[in-house]
Amino acid sequence: VYKRQLIQKHLPNEADKVSTTVSPMVACGRYVKSEYPEAVTVFIGPCIAKKGEARKFSDAIDYVLTFEELACMMAGAEIDPATLASESYINQASGFGISFPLLKGVQGALNHTLEELEETQVQAHYASGLEACLDDMKKLASGKLPCQYFEGMACVNGCIDGPGALAESGLVSVLIKKYASESQHKTVHGDTTAVKAVKKVDMEVR
């Protein structure tokens, strides 16, 4: 949402080139609402921009908490996660989906999807940090940056480095890569729930 606003403000002539697909948060929220109409959806992550996005897409997300806010709530309620019994969880997401918040995470999923579909690879470019994103987008608009697909992340080290994070991004990156490698789905389309959701849910910004 905010990257779209950034382009509309600084490069209005390029605004029509921005993807019209909603974020994973909104897509997931819409899918949950379609399956369970009475569900209350809560997004928990390191990103404070998601709060504004949730207001815009109230059809999908009811509440947003950062990891820091969740930790404060648990501390206030005197809940220590380390003392709670653990439960097994079967991860249904693909390794590529899990890797979305990492540097070039979306680009990796895109490239693998093109390989799966036996399509021609695109010339991609990546930038992180709003200043770097804007600089490179200006180069792209002026024809100085050859690129067919541009992935930009507002936070310097990707989503894992959001202001509401509690752990150092380098450590989080290692843990996410390990978690992704353990996924039973090694291809993008292996995540059958996600494939079903894409076909069922409106993925367009509206």
Outline where the language-model segments fall.
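Iron-sulfur-associated redox domains of electron-transfer enzymes in respiratory
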Residues: K3-R206
